[in-house]
């Protein structure tokens, strides 16, 4: 390496013979200066450039790893959210089906209750009609009996004397009282 450096120094002492030679002015441009500057840059800059590229590579790899981790986390969260969504949809379907079946059950219960109420009302109506018929029949019987008694009394009055008349009336009143007790019971 010393020989190379010495040779470059020797070049610097050569008298300039025109346009070719070693120029000590770093800003001057000629092929030798350019090759020396490039050689120095490559020799010393290779480590710095390598370190910069390695640092950049590490940052990129870290960013990629972080992105992969975030992506995996996002995929995991998405899967969890999809599982929760499926669960909620299943529960919603179950509630919907149960709700419809509950509505149908309530509807059937209401219809059955209405039929039961209608049957009870029909029974009450029939009982009321039967009771009213019995009452009317009893009233008709009483009127018929009263008219028959009045007719019999009229016939008896015309045919019987006072004593016989009183006995017949007493017997009829007793019989009428017995019938009246049976009717009112």
From Swiss-Prot:
Statement: the UniProt record of this protein carries the keyword Transmembrane: yes
Annotated TM spans: 27-49
Subcellular location: Plastid, Chloroplast thylakoid membrane
Keyword Protease belongs to the record: no
MF-aspect GO terms: ATP binding; proton-transporting ATP synthase activity, rotational mechanism
GO CC entries: chloroplast thylakoid membrane; proton-transporting ATP synthase complex
Keywords: ATP synthesis, ATP-binding, CF(0), Chloroplast, Hydrogen ion transport, Ion transport, Membrane, Nucleotide-binding, Plastid, Thylakoid, Transmembrane, Transmembrane helix, Transport
Main localization category: plastid
CDD domains registered for this protein in UniProt: ATP-synt_Fo_b
Topological type in the membrane: Single-pass membrane protein
Annotated InterPro entries: ATP_synth_b/b'su_bac/chlpt (IPR002146)
Pfam families per the UniProt record, alphabetical: ATP-synt_B
Purpose: F(1)F(0) ATP synthase produces ATP from ADP in the presence of a proton or sodium gradient. F-type ATPases consist of two structural domains, F(1) containing the extramembraneous catalytic core and F(0) containing the membrane proton channel, linked together by a central stalk and a peripheral stalk. During catalysis, ATP synthesis in the catalytic domain of F(1) is coupled via a rotary mechanism of the central stalk subunits to proton translocation.
Note: In plastids the F-type ATPase is also known as CF(1)CF(0).
Family recorded in the similarity comment: Belongs to the ATPase B chain family.
Subunit: F-type ATPases have 2 components, F(1) - the catalytic core - and F(0) - the membrane proton channel. F(1) has five subunits: alpha(3), beta(3), gamma(1), delta(1), epsilon(1). F(0) has four main subunits: a(1), b(1), b'(1) and c(10-14). The alpha and beta chains form an alternating ring which encloses part of the gamma chain. F(1) is attached to F(0) by a central stalk formed by the gamma and epsilon chains, while a peripheral stalk is formed by the delta, b and b' chains.
Name recorded for this polypeptide: ATP synthase subunit b, chloroplastic
